[in-house]
């Protein structure tokens, strides 16, 4: 509620979540009747970003309430590993806490449908970074990114069919590299490859070619689950071994 509820409750009900009002108290401003009427139902669609799932555990607040941040008030500590040192899902690069949990996108979409009345949703970002230490061959083969997008699209397709979630679009993050918060250019992104030492060396990665086939297949054939499942086969592992 201190994350999505902070803005979703006002957008749908014209007020902050009950638990926020209880914990934050007078430090949380109230909506006037006019403000509540103005903001409730004022959105056209929701743009949701999903990358990964984290564990949460209670976190005491040692500071006076007037010095609390939103995270302090939430009273939780988000972690990559549980008490047994386990990640929620498969690990790509443990030194960078790089893992994925594709079923999480199913739960998130179902949660938004159930709690907020099945709003119109676009997945505005979904993707993963890969280690900057990979070789050129590994970057172009890009089997990790294929597995990531494929597995998430499988669960996204599943929740649309099973739960009737109103998702109308999906944007793979990202087309090329970007400067990542806290990591700079030490990790790589993108469906396309660019050699920073030779900008004429540019190639569409295997992940980009795969995404092209997926998009084209989706437009021509509404039944795409078989394509998604077949993409999670040993073919990607063969590409990895070839490098």
From Swiss-Prot:
Example GO molecular function: beta-glucosidase activity
Pfam families named among the record's database cross-references: Glyco_hydro_1
Glycosylation sites: 30, 216
Binding residue positions for substrate: 51, 173, 180-181
UniProt KW keywords: Glycoprotein, Glycosidase, Hydrolase, Vacuole
Subunit structure: Homodimer.
PANTHER family given in the database record: GLYCOSYL HYDROLASE (PTHR10353), THIOGLUCOSIDASE (PTHR10353:SF231)
Chain's role: Degradation of glucosinolates (glucose residue linked by a thioglucoside bound to an amino acid derivative) to glucose, sulfate and any of the products: thiocyanates, isothiocyanates, nitriles, epithionitriles or oxazolidine-2-thiones.
Name by which UniProt lists this protein: Myrosinase MB2
């Amino acid at each position: 509620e201190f994350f999505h509820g902070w803005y979703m409750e006002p957008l749908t009900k014209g007020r902050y979540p009950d638990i926020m009002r209880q914990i934050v108290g007078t430090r949380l401003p109230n909506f006037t009747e006019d403000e509540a009427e103005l903001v409730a139902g004022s959105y056209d669609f929701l743009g949701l970003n999903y990358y990964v799932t984290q564990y949460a555990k209670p976190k005491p607040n040692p500071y006076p309430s007037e010095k609390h941040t939103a995270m302090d008030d939430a009273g939780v500590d988000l972690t990559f590993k549980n008490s047994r040192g386990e990640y929620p899902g498969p690990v790509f690069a443990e030194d960078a806490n790089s893992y994925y949990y594709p079923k999480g996108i199913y739960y998130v979409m179902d949660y938004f449908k159930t709690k907020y009345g099945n709003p119109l949703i676009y997945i505005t970002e979904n993707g993963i970074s890969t280690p900057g230490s990979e070789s050129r061959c590994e970057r172009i083969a890009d089997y990790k990114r294929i597995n990531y997008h494929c597995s998430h699209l499988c669960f996204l397709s599943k929740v649309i069919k099973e739960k009737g979630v109103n998702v109308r679009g999906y944007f793979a993050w990202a087309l090329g590299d970007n400067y990542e918060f806290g990591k700079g250019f030490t990790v790589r992104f993108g469906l396309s490859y660019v050699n920073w030492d030779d900008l004429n060396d540019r190639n569409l990665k295997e992940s980009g070619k795969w995404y092209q086939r997926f998009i084209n297949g989706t437009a021509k054939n509404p039944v795409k689950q078989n394509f998604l499942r077949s993409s999670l086969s040993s073919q990607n592992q063969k590409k990895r071994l070839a490098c």
